[in-house]
Amino acid sequence: MYKRQILACGCFWGPEIKFSKLNGVYKTEVGYCGGNTSKTSYQEVCEGDTNHAEVVKLDFDPNIISYEKILDYFFEIHDPTTLNSQGLDFGTQYRSEIFYLNDNQKNIAKKMIEKYNKILSGKIVTKLSQIKNYCTAEEYHQKYLEKR
């Protein structure tokens, strides 16, 4: 049985292709999550009116890859110490955020944030939130880097 995780770590194109290559991750999809509306568009998200983050939704097999390993990778592929930015991308849609589905995911994510606060220089600014108002991004964003 697959498990699901939704993660925000900057522009969703790069993280999607990276997560899709992990052994045990069977499906990735980019979208928007954590905003004030149940539906949104890329333009609305970029304008900053909806408070959605660009996210990667992934379905994984916990018998092959653990939730902890996915979160380890999450912390490795972006800078969780920069507020509302990754590289040259700035705005709340590029924030670092872990969206949890249940209390077990929430508790594990809290421990992982504590772990990386001890390892990394700089304070972790990754938010931890229950999944709210997820919607799939437009088709042209799906597998964007694979299409190039």
Feature locations, PLM:
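Flexible coil/turn and secondary-structure edge motifs
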Residues: 2-148
